[in-house]
């Protein structure tokens, strides 16, 4: 009856919750983070039936949703810095969403929380409903299950406990028997005292009688039997008091012995269970540690490319993790590039030599006289002066070239504070640490001497856009925005994304020029100068961070005369390269990461490029 009453009362309590209507459905446009390439994109989001779904647009809902998550176990987290953003995570899946304004965000959060509360996991009424049946079943069988499992491996202890119960029953019976005997004895003593009092009174009232012969006749009531009659207490017949006392003593001795044995068994069992507990605790600790590490790795993978881990002032990734991620990405790019180069070498044979009409002989040495076309591997541009290079950036080009020829070729000693950061054979890389508003602006200067090539050849390969993809591995795409002159072009190029750093693009003017020698002893000098400019055809965009550059490749050709009348070969020429780079990367990349990456990438670039030039010019006529 009580069970029925409890069920009825429980049902009456749930009636109001059952009658309450479902949560209100909601739909609208929210910005969703797609990936690090496309960033935030507007999506049509629908909140319905305790699930959150999104579509590309409202018009495409009939084609099905692009993604959906159940809100039962979802965690909604408003962002600490962005007032319009909130994140929804379910296990290792995370949605990054942005509303139009803070009020709009709060409306969405409230609606999602309401759906979550009304779901099976979030509702208290659901917990009561599901918990009631479980509690009834478990309450009925809990004790029996526990006792059964406890005694499965405890036969000795169970037997000793049975002995204790037997001792208890024996002791109770013995106590009852002895108590009964003592009560009977007490009743008998009381009755005997009353009888004695009565006998004494009768004796006092009994006078002697006169016999016929005149003698006194005394009564025999005063004899022993009359004065102290033998009274047997009722109820004590058949009780062996001595035997009961001995048995009682043995029982009381057996109880402590059995109890001691029980305690000993329990101590042994406790030690055994303690060892098992310690083992399980250690296993639990290892499991929790492995789970924690696994969850950490899963979170890293799930947030890979997430907006919180991107380069920025509020990035959640520290400098060490930032550098590790950048280094790992660069290593992957290097592996891909090595595979690509191996495939090119296997499939493509080196470019054939130009036809004979492109050469003329002077003495016994052949050199290129006719320029290559723009589509050829190298274009020869004979520029002795800048008189024909008149365009709107001419004055800026002149200033840049003069500055590089004046300062870039100076010795690294003195007060310039150049630091030698890399030295590999004849190649040396120097750096001056410069920061402005927290942004690293370190100028870098690299010098290297390359045998078998001329400065003209090196500069042509560095300037010519037709062969740029053959040696430049960091560019995603590029195009010529404007051709200012035969030796001056404006280029827009986008560099490959290296997560977590933001993607960079560069808009710069590239000019190649031959510097006239002031004296006969001065070496032949060529220069390629690249510096950032602005152009209406390539405005800033939100996808990339615009970097600013000022780069110069200065090459001087040194010729050692051949022995006798032999012709000049590539063994007699040496190119002294001076590469100077001033780069403002923009953005929020950590200074330590930028310096470490520059120290790694600049020497690798210079070695890769010069090796490429040596490979391309091997076996070809020398281009002075």
UniProtKB/Swiss-Prot annotation:
Domain START, chain residue ranges per copy: 389-618
Chain span(s) of sequence motif FFAT: 321-327
Modification sites for Phosphoserine: 126, 132, 135, 315, 373, 377, 380
Keywords tagged on the record: Coiled coil, Cytoplasm, Endoplasmic reticulum, Golgi apparatus, Lipid transport, Lipid-binding, Phosphoprotein, Transport
Positions contributing to an N-acylsphing-4-enine binding: 472, 493, 530, 579
Modification type Phosphotyrosine: residues: 372
Composition bias type Polar residues, residue spans: 1-11
Subunit structure: Interacts with VAPA and VAPB. Interaction with VAPB is less efficient than with VAPA. Interacts (via FFAT motif) with the MOSPD2 (via MSP domain).
This protein's name: Ceramide transfer protein
Source organism per UniProt: Pongo abelii (Sumatran orangutan)
Gene designation: CERT1
